[in-house]
């Protein structure tokens, strides 16, 4: 009765889980144009296979499910989930059927998809391929295919001989394990807040949009940084914007990990507070932000060094204006005569 909730186009959907079982890894396949290499370095490494029920209806939903599963595993410290390294992989089964038909069509398996984007692309292509065969009254064979990243198509690996053709062997030295229901409930009760739960809380508690909450919770470290920052200042929306735009932009541009940045949560909170109070402009704040990212220092130290505090005292500002007008009477006359460039000069 397990499931994960996904969010696609702001619509929530429950993806049910059929079962979870343990396996041993065999080898990593490296496919080339005319041959395939096998890397046996991870042979015998234990892995968890999580099988969903067939209620995923598109490549987009499948990608959202893998993303949610990945985030859940990361939140629970189960795995680093690096798809490019093979620590998280995805096989998909694709079938089509006419509207109104209850029985599923012939299932085609696509093996070892190594990125979330490829999951979506492979499914979308395979659906089109099967539709084309169906409309031509051609047979859709039960087979195993792989996704070719160059051509963005699925390529035949082998034909299947039966509906159950998994090529696996049971481990006779390990008896079946029956998990106690009370133990399962205890584990569930003690789980930390999971990404989907956190996303809903961010919307309700902090008034964030669905998009903002989804981005912030898509990365465990980002969510922790956000919560550490709002503990010091409570403009949730502005802090979220600075994290999603400026911080993630800097991290991606410089190819660094979020956990390795120099800026501390309390410094970002102080920066946002100064913007709110009108003591520095957004442009000035970006300059301070760059300095915070490059070296461990406080906001106050940077502002003092850069001498960029914004003056909001209207009496002081009026006094300076009068000084400028008195110092440049010719420019005042030019502006009054319609020469706008004089204003820029002053």
Regions found by a protein language model. Give the residues of each.
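Basic, nucleic-acid-interacting segments
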Residues: 1-193, 204, 210, 231-235
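Generic, well-ordered alpha-helical scaffold segments in large soluble proteins
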Residues: 65-68, 72-75, 122, 126-130, ...
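Structural motif corresponding to the C-terminal cap of alpha-helices
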Residues: 73, 77, 251, 325-332
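Core structural elements
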Residues: 86-98, 166, 203-225, 236-253, ...
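Extended, charged alpha-helical coiled-coil/arm scaffolds that mediate oligomerization and mechanical coupling
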Residues: 278-279
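Strongly charged, low-complexity linkers/loops
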Residues: 259-269, 282-346
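Conserved structured core elements
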Residues: 41-44, 59, 63, 86, ...
């Amino acid at each position: 009765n397990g499931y994960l909730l996904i969010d696609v186009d702001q619509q929530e959907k429950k993806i049910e889980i059929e079962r979870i079982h343990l396996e041993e890894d065999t080898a990593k396949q490296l496919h080339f144009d005319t041959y395939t290499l096998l890397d046996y370095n991870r042979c015998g490494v234990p892995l968890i296979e999580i099988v969903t029920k067939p209620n995923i209806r598109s490549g987009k939903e499948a990608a959202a499910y893998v993303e949610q599963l990945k985030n859940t595993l990361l939140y629970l410290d189960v795995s680093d989930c690096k798809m490019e390294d093979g620590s998280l992989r995805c096989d998909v089964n694709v079938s089509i059927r006419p509207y109104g038909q209850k029985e599923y069509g012939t299932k085609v398996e696509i093996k070892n998809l190594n990125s979330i984007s490829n999951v979506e692309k492979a499914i979308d292509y395979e659906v089109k391929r099967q539709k084309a065969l169906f409309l031509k009254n051609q047979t859709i064979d039960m087979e195993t295919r792989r996704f070719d990243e160059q051509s963005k198509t699925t390529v035949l690996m082998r034909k299947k001989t039966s509906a159950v053709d998994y090529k696996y062997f049971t481990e006779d030295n390990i008896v079946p394990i029956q998990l106690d229901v009370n133990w399962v409930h205890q584990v569930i009760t003690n789980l930390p807040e999971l990404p989907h739960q956190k996303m809903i809380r961010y919307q309700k508690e902090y008034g964030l949009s669905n998009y903002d909450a989804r981005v912030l919770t898509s990365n465990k470290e980002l969510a922790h940084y956000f919560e550490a920052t709002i503990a010091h200042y409570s403009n949730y929306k502005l802090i979220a914007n600075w994290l999603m735009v400026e911080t993630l932009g800097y991290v991606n541009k410089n190819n660094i990990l979020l956990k390795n940045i120099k800026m501390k949560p309390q410094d970002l909170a102080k920066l946002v507070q100064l913007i709110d109070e009108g003591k520095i402009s957004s442009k000035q704040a970006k300059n301070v932000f760059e300095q915070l990212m490059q070296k461990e220092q406080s906001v106050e130290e940077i502002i003092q060094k850069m001498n960029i505090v914004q003056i909001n005292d209207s009496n002081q500002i009026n006094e300076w204006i009068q000084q400028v007008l008195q110092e440049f009477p010719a420019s005042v006359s030019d502006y009054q005569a319609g020469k706008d460039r004089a204003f820029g000069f002053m």
